[in-house]
């Protein structure tokens, strides 16, 4: 089995993370987890209080245990809160262990007047590696806002990354961005939004994946597999996910297909170990 750390991570996530010690013995970097504290006096925007699985404190001591049990040596946090101060909250939360928590993909609203100010301030910390597009203010007219393109250009100029969540965005959106900003490093979240049903992958989805993957700066995370399953509880057998994973492997290859779990959301479908076993099973013969 090839190590679940690929060359793109060195350039995308580790550049600027001066505290990270390169070590050939590190087998796995999880590029997609969330940390939050539901007991904070100010509360938090996500997860909702009625989520019986996720609404509880999810802090470093909880992921430390999971990562130690499963051989995860380093991780990148993806900020799930839309509150700007929560970016710094996470950076402060993990500053005691910079070798394990090596980066943060932040949450800032693209196309807003203060985007550059907030990005500049947060980027003074080398662990702040980029942002994620999650919500889509303005709906279909979002990309008609030139301020959006100015902010995306700023990310590209800074050599920072753009994570794209497929719930309100599409692979066609990714393709459009790459055509206008070919040097922007993009990481598509959650197996490119695949609808996984345990049967041959949707031909339209395959074509969209292949189109988006033509740009060498577009990468894809094998994250959220359990969440993309139409069958619940999520199957734990690799064969159920094989078709979509094969498509992604053919499109992105070993250099641009990146491991991420989406923990603790993975717990809706199974344990971390069960999730990792599916991914390791896929890479076993690669």
Where are these regions (language model features)?
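An N-terminally biased module of ancient metal coordination in phosphate/nucleic-acid-related enzymes
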Residues: 20-89, 94
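H/E-rich (His + Asp/Glu) clusters that bind or coordinate divalent metals
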Residues: 195-286
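Short, well-ordered coil/turn segments that N-cap beta-strands
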Residues: 24-27, 71-76, 98-103, 125-129, ...
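Active-site gating/metal-coordination segments in enzymes
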Residues: 84-169, 176-179, 221-227, 233-235
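Mid-to-C-terminal alpha-helical segments outside catalytic/metal-binding sites
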Residues: 2-4, 19-21, 26-31, 56-74, ...
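C-terminal motif of bacterial Sec signal peptides marking the signal peptidase cleavage site
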Residues: 15-16
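Active-site metal-binding loops of divalent metal-dependent hydrolases
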Residues: 33, 80, 191, 262-263
């Amino acid at each position: 089995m090839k190590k679940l750390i690929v060359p793109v991570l060195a350039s995308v996530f580790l550049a600027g993370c001066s505290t990270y010690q390169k070590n050939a013995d590190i087998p796995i970097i999880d590029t997609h987890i969330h940390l939050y504290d539901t007991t904070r006096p100010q509360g938090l925007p996500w997860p909702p209080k009625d989520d019986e699985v996720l609404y509880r404190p999810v802090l470093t001591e909880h992921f430390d245990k999971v990562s130690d049990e499963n051989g995860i040596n380093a991780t990148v946090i993806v900020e799930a809160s839309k509150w700007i101060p929560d970016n710094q909250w996470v950076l402060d939360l993990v500053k005691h262990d910079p070798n394990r928590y090596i980066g943060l993909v932040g949450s800032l609203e693209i196309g807003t007047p203060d985007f550059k100010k907030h990005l500049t301030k947060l980027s003074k910390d080398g662990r702040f590696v980029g942002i994620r597009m999650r919500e889509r203010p303005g709906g279909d007219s979002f990309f008609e806002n030139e301020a959006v393109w100015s902010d995306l250009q700023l990310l590209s100029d800074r050599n920072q990354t753009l994570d794209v969540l497929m719930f309100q965005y599409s692979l066609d959106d990714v393709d459009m961005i790459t055509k206008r900003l070919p040097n922007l490093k993009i990481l598509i979240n959650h197996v490119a939004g695949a609808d996984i049903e345990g049967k041959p992958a949707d031909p339209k989805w395959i074509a969209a994946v292949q189109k988006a993957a033509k740009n060498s700066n577009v990468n894809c995370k094998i994250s959220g597999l359990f969440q993309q399953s139409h069958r619940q509880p999520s199957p734990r057998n690799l064969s159920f996910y094989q078709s979509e994973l094969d498509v992604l492997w053919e499109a992105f290859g070993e250099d641009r297909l990146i491991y991420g779990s989406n923990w603790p959301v993975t717990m809706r479908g199974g344990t971390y170990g069960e999730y990792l076993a599916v991914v390791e099973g896929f890479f076993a013969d690669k």
